[in-house]
A protein has these predicted regions:
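Eukaryotic interaction-scaffold segments
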Residues: 1-127
Length: 127
């Protein structure tokens, strides 16, 4: 995996996060190393903090993310992405928790940021 590809995807993700008004911790070094803790922060933002409509939609679909352990949280996210949003991750839950696979995690995070924004817009139209 090239350093250029990692840097490019990291910049793209940062742009999406700015669009989403993400104001929490941004540690590029952690992202580029594949640190699962940094990615968990991002996923908490995407699925719990970004939009009240998204949060409600998740609960209405039977997911309980707020009190879930990290493992359960990620398992539920992967299931939700596949069953509710038609997205199948190339990354496994097991690999998500390994401090590697940075490009796959960046790709997943970027894709999820786009999917969540699209879903939030569709929920705002219907509510």
């Amino acid at each position: 995996m090239s350093e250029v590809a990692l840097q490019s995807k990291c910049r793209s993700l940062r742009t999406e996060l700015r669009t989403m008004k993400y104001a929490s911790i941004w540690n590029e070094k952690s992202l580029l190393s594949g640190d699962p803790g940094m990615y968990l922060r991002l996923f908490h933002f995407f699925f719990i903090e970004y939009s009240p409509q998204i949060k409600t939609w998740i609960v209405e679909n039977g997911y309980n993310l707020q009190t879930a352990t990290d493992l359960s949280f990620v398992q539920q996210i992967f299931r939700l992405l596949q069953t509710q949003m038609g997205y199948r991750s190339k990354l496994t839950v097991e690999n998500f928790f390994k401090p590697k696979f940075a490009l796959q995690k960046l790709n997943l995070s970027y894709d999820v940021a786009k999917l969540i924004q699209t879903k939030a817009k569709s929920l705002n139209v219907t509510h």
